Amino acid sequence: MSYSGFRVMADSTPTLKKRLSGRSLYLVGMMGSGKTSTGRPLAERLGYGFVDADAVIEQAAGCSIPEIFERDGDAGFRSLESQVLSAISQRHSLVVATGGGVVTQPENWGLLHSGIVIWLDVVPDQLLQRLNADSTVRPLLQTTDPEASLNALLNERRPLYSEADLTVVINDETPEAVADGILQLLPSLLQDPTQRRTD
């Protein structure tokens, strides 16, 4: 199920929270797609807890994500990421901002689908603009041609992201507007579970 363009929520948030029955919401998408900035207001509106998986990984490793990549490589980082996701999935009533590459490990999908997976699909031009304005060090973009690297990653991951239960296409909406759009879309998914993972 996909959604683009946001309008006023039809279902009240308390009713929606009850219908979710404690299922966590996992936000997936490329780096810079706004998973953390959208996740916080989404969690606040639902009365859920918020978890930034990358922050938990850094806490567990005792160093930054770029340092983990430098020390342990991509495979080492992905292993730690899966361990952290497994621990997070034991809890409920959370909005979880995941790392951009969490979808690349098949074993993570069983954990993600313990809740509802929401893909924040930012149009490529907007994504590049966001990343250029962001001072965060992105290990996978430390190349001579970051734009080409970003496009290659997006092409590789797009089929994986499309396995999400909900797809929200984002242009230049604010994180708060995206959070409201997700809340507007969720009742349809909960009403008809057969719509999960369809576009």
Curated annotation (Swiss-Prot):
Q: In which pathway does it act?
A: Metabolic intermediate biosynthesis; chorismate biosynthesis; chorismate from D-erythrose 4-phosphate and phosphoenolpyruvate: step 5/7
Alphabetically sorted, this entry's keywords are: Amino-acid biosynthesis, Aromatic amino acid biosynthesis, ATP-binding, Cytoplasm, Kinase, Magnesium, Metal-binding, Nucleotide-binding, Transferase
- E.C. number, please? 2.7.1.71
Q: Which domain of life is it from?
A: Bacteria
**Positions of Mg(2+) binding:** 36
The record's subunit annotation is: Monomer.
* Function summary: Catalyzes the specific phosphorylation of the 3-hydroxyl group of shikimic acid using ATP as a cosubstrate.
PANTHER family referenced in this protein's UniProt entry, alphabetically: SHIKIMATE KINASE, SHIKIMATE KINASE 1, CHLOROPLASTIC
The name on file for this protein is Shikimate kinase
Q: Which gene encodes it?
A: aroK
